[in-house]
């Protein structure tokens, strides 16, 4: 009808702001969460999954492997795409990809950016789900990734964790 829309657009990370979220599962069938300083949240810290931006020169799979290594010191030979979603399509074109990383092995020390304060925490998958259900995991991208993995486990289409 000829109307012009004006919208704000938030730019984060790389030019597009695309990000990856990784649910690491170790060879012992544990998962790895990160506890990260988050000054913008009420609690000041957040329990979440390893995550980060896709750099301009890499694929989402390469970004997932890099972030896993940087935040936890772990590597994986098997990445499974769990799903993709827009982070906040009202203000951003950022497109996030959630991965399951199987048979993770800790081989390195963390390689954090100078503005990152992250500790990792290894626990049973069921404990991670309990933290989610009790409201300790509050970021939507970690919630989404854990719920997608939980659905696959219930359907029997994913490795058994017990």
PLM feature spans:
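Short connector loops/turns at beta-strand edges and beta->alpha or beta->beta junctions
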Residues: 37-40, 104
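Beta-strand scaffold of nucleotide-dependent catalytic cores
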Residues: 21, 32-36
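A conserved beta-turn-beta hairpin within the catalytic core of GNAT-like acetyltransferases
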Residues: 41-47
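Charged phosphate-binding loop/patch that engages nucleotide di/tri-phosphates or the phosphate backbone
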Residues: 143-162
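Unchanged
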Residues: 18-21, 26, 52-140, 159-161
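A short acidic/small-residue loop/turn micro-motif
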Residues: 12-13, 39-41
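Acidic, metal-coordinating catalytic segment for phosphate/diphosphate chemistry
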Residues: 1-23, 27
